[in-house]
Amino acid sequence: MTTKPIHVIGGGLAGSEAAWQAAEAGVPVILHEMRPVRGTDAHKTDGLAELVCSNSFRSDDAQTNAVGLLHAEMRLAGSLIMRAGDANQVPAGGALAVDRDGFSDAVTQAIHGHPLITVVREEVAGLPPSEWDQTIIATGPLTAPSLAEAIRQETGAEALAFFDAIAPIVHFDTIDMDTCWFQSRYDKAGPGGTGKDYINCPMNKEQYQAFVQALLDGEKTAFKEWEGTPYFDGCLPIEVMAERGPETLRHGPMKPMGLTNAHKPDEKAYAVVQLRQDNALGTLYNMVGFQTKLKYAEQVRIFRMIPGLENAEFARLGGLHRNTYINSPALLDITLQLKSRPGLRFAGQITGCEGYVESAAMGLMAGRFAAAARLGRKMMPPPATTAFGSLISHITGGHILSEDEPGKRSFQPMNVNFGLFPPVELPKPEGKRLRGKEKTLAKKRAITARALADCSDWLGVPTRAAAE
């Protein structure tokens, strides 16, 4: 066992997971978190692993969904983030959603309670000193300007950025349940769910058209120097989606499919707004897909146009912050280490992965890589056939050449998805040729079965541990 610590900068999901993994490997860790000494535009507390956007970890289906597969692999690897998420889940259909305060508290208590982890509340204003040696930067999308500038100078490259928006949260007791009803889409029950995990607010055609026009006309926050920054398609502001066409929203977050109005079962809604439980008590619900850059007064006015939310009181209104990430394919090796400075690793959203779970997964990997290096052990990266490996491959090199700039690789933030995995040979049922949805489902099952088997072999643990 070594006495020289690994330093982790940033106490978000990636940093907390990295610290946990390294400490569990027997290596001392110093975790540096700048809050509350220095706050950010999006964080509200000084807790570790605070969720500043959605409270959803998305699908928990490990057989036919890529992020559900990543959940399973992280459980196999002893993830603190997944342990805390499972312990603080709230009903959310087929998704794993968590009570954000309970989740953060669980991670904070676990980190502070680990005998090999020391938490230091301070801002690291520049790149770490060389004597720190093994260091992980996991400062996320809200990296302090001084550190961001130091990273830019070290890498010789401009940081890339995109907007990330936050959805409003509504007090449950101000929602009109004589208009709204509980139902998951297609009555699908997820972990801890009942098939009635979302609140649904129906709109007829006239109400929908008036709502879309209000979104288009509503006063937005101006961003000046950020205005030219591209959005990430997975987290578009609701008004930006409305700008893409009058029918865009009812084919996106407001789609009515798979839902039946409990009060008027014979009346088909033209569009539906869904709200998802945000805390364990069930007193708060967030508006699914309603991240926004509308000004606060406009949010209240426009969102109260939604049937059932006419008297809604908001626990939190929507907002917008900027995500910053590095050009990882050019800068990082396959162990997430900076090519120009061995021993310095990056993890989480700053690497260009998108999503809570993906960020935590890369923290998990960085923590294990750093611990192995500190202990003088050679650690092979996870197979590319696993969700872990597919994300690392994406971050460190799985990109096409840019047609606009020959010789430069195209690199954009990415959620885990089946398109990142190597092809798999489908099973061939005797006397039957798979087609359409059946073929797609079989392909997903084949990819996930291969991934879990390969991940189990790589970790040296039985596959069944993923469900524990």
From Swiss-Prot:
Domain of life: Bacteria
Keyword presence, tRNA processing: yes
Catalytic activity as recorded in UniProt: uridine(54) in tRNA + (6R)-5,10-methylene-5,6,7,8-tetrahydrofolate + NADH + H(+) = 5-methyluridine(54) in tRNA + (6S)-5,6,7,8-tetrahydrofolate + NAD(+); uridine(54) in tRNA + (6R)-5,10-methylene-5,6,7,8-tetrahydrofolate + NADPH + H(+) = 5-methyluridine(54) in tRNA + (6S)-5,6,7,8-tetrahydrofolate + NADP(+)
Enzyme nomenclature, EC number: 2.1.1.74
Pfam family, any one: GIDA
Main location: cytoplasm
GO cellular component, one term: cytosol
Keyword terms, alphabetized: Cytoplasm, FAD, Flavoprotein, Methyltransferase, NAD, NADP, Transferase, tRNA processing
Cofactor names: FAD
SUPFAM superfamilies: FAD/NAD(P)-binding domain
InterPro entries per UniProt: FAD/NAD-bd_sf, MnmG-rel, MnmG-rel_CS, MnmG_N, TrmFO
Molecular function per GO: flavin adenine dinucleotide binding; tRNA (uracil(54)-C5)-methyltransferase activity, 5,10-methylenetetrahydrofolate-dependent
GO biological process, one term: tRNA wobble uridine modification
Residues that hold FAD according to the record: G10, G11, G12, L13, A14, G15
Function text: Catalyzes the folate-dependent formation of 5-methyl-uridine at position 54 (M-5-U54) in all tRNAs.
Recorded family membership: Belongs to the MnmG family. TrmFO subfamily.
Annotated protein name in UniProt: Methylenetetrahydrofolate--tRNA-(uracil-5-)-methyltransferase TrmFO
